[in-house]
């Protein structure tokens, strides 16, 4: 046996030859020292023990060779001296004051003892040292041995803790790649919290989340971080200032006179201009506005409504209506995946084995909610192994998610989405953009809804039959909602399902407890002998928000999840609508005053409001003429049969041809120049008609019968060319239109040139079809 290597327990120590003289070579003789030197050295050791600092090499060598008897005598002498000083302080305090200083002093000493590293024994016989940041570079007495703590990442105790083995080495060995080692005692574990200490270095700080811009969704909703809302609002402010120069100048003068300082003046003017109320009644405050005009005898119109837009319906002998799609939402949609944006790591434990001792194991490896990693570390003589090589090491940490740091996905059900449509008649009352008209009615539709009839008071009834379409592919759409932590951030976004499912974040389904792919927010450090650090990647909210730039924004109001893009196609029945005030007498022309002078609405129309001091109710005489043709009324009234009622009225909206015009309301007159081009207006209305027909898609055609095909063709013609036809021949009567169509068809039949013949025939047919048609 003398020639063989001997391994010590639990991996063994360095191999050595059994020799009778070996103990004499390694053991140092404890010779007698001067008593004064021993006392001075013991005071130094005591000082370092009280302050928690590391001892110098001289004191370490002294502690190893000092005779036990001399050390005990020196400590007893120090104890007697401290006791004498304590008694003297107590006596002096009792003579001068009644305050007992002994009790606070003892409490302070005991508290200091409690705050130092504590040692406890587990049921399996192992010892556990619980240390804190102040215990770094200190020795701890454990039974008959001592343990040295060299860890630098210790903080105050909390859930973010770390536990690993304190290796046992011999007196002659030097520690290698360990933060804790013991001599004279085995099976010791070090545990400490890491709160309050500085974060360690990480190779990465975020996960990789691709931008969502490559997966565009259909629809024209507001997009986050695109700047469109700011641009749109600045455009509105600019338009209002340009149309209200006098009011703007007055506002600037008032601010300049009432406020001192250049910067406050500028701020007040800018804020006031951003909040100024513009002329607004029903659809006039919306930029996306469309006009649909029915010909004489029209009883049914097909409208295309989209979020953020409005359609004004006008027809001969019928009151004008504003119809718009107000909201698209679903109550409490189903929840799909839930992602964690900020991990909370607690209870880290490490187990390690020497080479050839098998794999390291931890019970936490088989528990849910933990993240583990296996690796190999360098082991050898300086860290309690008899062989040099790679040893197994495993680290596990408990994973949970921080509060208010989750991103949840919700999916829509097509059958449960509600579309809210609002209808409002033109009553001649001025209503500001932030006010609600008393005659406004609402109707809600789903996929299974039938026809709805709305009662508009004195204006009769209007029927709505709508086919809903979301404007986005709901099967591939997920509403990504964040916990609301910052008021300036949006609440939710409409994202593509594939992008949502591919997010590199921990996730779980609704109701589940364990997180899948929890290791995506955890990083493990380089393995040391018996320790492997664990790092938290931190909050990933900023990375997610960056990837959402350009994504359509959704909104959540209570349990209602709103879509920000979509459209519906509605058939509006006008047969039961009736005009109000047809039997009123005409108002006295001399008693009108301007309440709001004519101004451009931004939709190629003119809006105004007049006051009346005569007897009510009555009909307002209003017309407009072009320069040089005073006998022809060129005004197309959007507000039909404007009246002055007992409790309101006087708001008028009309459309004028481009050029110089004069507006007459009673004896009032106003010079007005209408910007634009007649040809451009025709082309624009034709373009809008084509857009409406495109949105209608397959719903615009009925191939079930010959009559259905002819009806579909007529409806398509009215949809595409109705606006242009009304612009060109809107002021021409019914009979002249019939005669014009017949004349053009007759000319086409008698033309010898085939091209001209076909042109006249098509033109005459269109005029007759648009005049005699009953739907648009």
UniProtKB/Swiss-Prot annotation:
Disulfide cross-links: 283-310, 340-396, 354-385, 372-401, 466-570, 587-618
Glycosylated residues in this chain: 144, 434
Extracellular side: 118-242, 281-727, 749-755
UniProt xrefs under InterPro entries: Env_glycoprot_M_flavivir (IPR000069), Env_glycoprot_M_sf_flavivir (IPR038302), Flav_gly_cen_dom_subdom1 (IPR013755), Flavi_capsidC (IPR001122), Flavi_E_Ig-like (IPR027287), Flavi_E_Stem/Anchor_dom (IPR026470), Flavi_E_Stem/Anchor_dom_sf (IPR038345), Flavi_Glycoprot_E_cen/dimer (IPR011998)
Start and end residues of each stretch annotated as Disordered: 1-27
Topological domain spans for side Cytoplasmic: 1-98, 261
The keyword Membrane is assigned to this record: yes
Region (Hydrophobic): 33-68
Alphabetical keyword list: Capsid protein, Clathrin-mediated endocytosis of virus by host, Cleavage on pair of basic residues, Disulfide bond, Fusion of virus membrane with host endosomal membrane, Fusion of virus membrane with host membrane, Glycoprotein, Host endoplasmic reticulum, Host membrane, Host-virus interaction, Membrane, Secreted, Transmembrane, Transmembrane helix, Viral attachment to host cell, Viral envelope protein, Viral penetration into host cytoplasm, Virion, Virus endocytosis by host, Virus entry into host cell
Pro-sequence residue ranges: 97-117
PTM annotation, UniProt: Specific enzymatic cleavages in vivo yield mature proteins Peptide 2K acts as a signal sequence and is removed from the N-terminus of NS4B by the host signal peptidase in the ER lumen. Signal cleavage at the 2K-4B site requires a prior NS3 protease-mediated cleavage at the 4A-2K site.
Transmembrane segments: 99-117, 243-260, 262-280
A GO term from the CC aspect: extracellular region
Biological processes per GO annotation: clathrin-dependent endocytosis of virus by host cell; fusion of virus membrane with host endosome membrane; virion attachment to host cell
Start-end of intramembrane regions: 728-748, 756-776
Matching CDD domains: Flavi_E_C, Flavi_M
Keyword Phosphoprotein attributed: no
Single GO MF annotation: protein dimerization activity
Biased composition (Basic residues): 17-27
Record-linked NCBIfam families: flavi_E_stem
Free-text function comment from the UniProt entry: Capsid protein C self-assembles to form an icosahedral capsid about 30 nm in diameter. The capsid encapsulates the genomic RNA.
Protein name: Genome polyprotein
Annotated source species: Langat virus (strain Yelantsev)
